[in-house]
Curated annotation (Swiss-Prot):
It comes from the Bacteria. It comes from Proteus mirabilis (strain HI4320). GO terms for biological process: unsaturated fatty acid biosynthetic process. Its main location: cytoplasm. The gene is fabA. Keywords: Cytoplasm, Fatty acid biosynthesis, Fatty acid metabolism, Isomerase, Lipid biosynthesis, Lipid metabolism, Lyase. It is found in: Cytoplasm. This is 3-hydroxydecanoyl-[acyl-carrier-protein] dehydratase.
């Protein structure tokens, strides 16, 4: 049974990483340091500019986050790839929220643009995911556009984020 709500706490997201939110067959989120969000504040099945679904999530920035110590020494910045991964994580989470089963895998992105950075002085990152299409056949796949904001300023844009759910990843 899918635990389908419009918002999720950090504890809920951690439970997803253990396979407790969408069941053992649903797609888990990453756990530990690779979970790149602290809460989902809005999820809709029919929202967004394409009326195919929308997610808004947040990540609290603290100066002691693990990546600031190593990326880069004396020039700390959150790696842009972690923001991109967060958007893929949210696309996979949405597929599980819809009842999809399997392990989530990022399948690509059409275009990514970085116009800013996330520094240790920032307070909050906001992710917005706007779904364009969900394919539910042998392969379950979500296609979405995403935006990343730091303290309200748009800094990353991604077009055609693709995530698929796979019951068997041995040949992937």
């Amino acid at each position: 049974m899918v635990d389908k709500r419009e918002s999720y706490s950090k504890e809920d997201l951690i439970a997803s990483g253990r396979g407790e939110l969408f069941g053992q067959d649903g797609p888990p989120l990453p756990s530990g340091n690779m979970l790149m969000m602290d809460r989902i504040i809005k999820m809709t099945e029919d929202g967004g500019s394409h009326n195919k679904g929308f997610i808004e999530a947040e990540f609290d920035i603290k100066p002691d986050l693990w990546f600031f110590d190593c990326h880069f020494v004396n020039d700390p910045v959150m790696p842009g790839c972690l923001g991109l991964d967060a958007m893929w994580q949210l696309v996979g989470f949405y597929l599980g929220w819809l009842g999809g089963e399997g392990k989530g895998r990022a399948l690509g992105v059409g275009e990514v643009k970085f116009t800013g950075q996330i520094l240790p002085t920032a307070k909050k990152v906001t992710y917005k995911i706007d779904f364009k299409r969900v394919i539910n056949r042998k392969l379950i796949m979500g296609i979405a556009d995403g935006e990343v904001y730091v303290d309200g300023k748009l800094i990353y844009e991604a077009k055609d984020l693709k995530v698929g759910l796979f019951k068997d990843t041995s040949a992937f």
